[in-house]
Design a protein with these regions (language model features):
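Rhodanese-like catalytic fold shared by cysteine-dependent sulfurtransferases
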Residues: 1-21, 28-71, 82-130
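Short, surface-exposed ligand- or partner-binding patches at beta-edge/loop junctions that are enriched
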Residues: 75
Length: 130
């Protein structure tokens, strides 16, 4: 089963469960230029420009979390790619999967801007840029 947490809830979960891994599934460009949560593991689910699924995704996750009972929190821009990635991990046998709702940037506002009404960065959680 895949659970959902808001960014503040995910941050509290990570503090309470040091064995958990936060996996940022966004593209390399998003991770580097938009920013990313501090201490997140970067494993792209899809990559720009063709948006094909990363065929090494599952192997890369297994490198950082070999134990299928490791709690894995997945984060993307707004919460959809991370959910897709979590479904694949669930099929692969991972049992503690959490989709971070709102993602890093949150949904678009009325002006078609992100980061104004949700997301990791909006909530003031620890993040950095490369």
């Amino acid at each position: 089963m895949i659970d959902n947490l808001t960014p503040p809830q995910a941050w509290e979960f990570l503090k309470d469960h040091p064995e958990a891994k936060l996996i940022d599934v966004r593209t390399r460009m998003e991770y580097a230029f938009v920013g990313h949560p501090k201490d997140a593991v970067h494993i792209p689910w899809k990559e720009f420009p063709d948006w094909q699924v990363n065929d090494r995704f599952l192997d890369a996750v297994r490198e950082v979390a070999a134990d299928p009972d490791t709690p894995l929190l997945l984060l993307c821009r707004s919460g959809q790619r991370s959910l897709d990635a979590a479904r694949v991990l669930e099929q692969a046998g991972y049992r503690q999967l959490i989709n971070v709702l709102e993602g890093f940037e949150g949904d678009l506002d009325a002006e078609k801007h992100r980061g104004t009404q949700g997301g990791w960065r909006f909530h003031g959680l620890p993040w950095e840029q490369s």
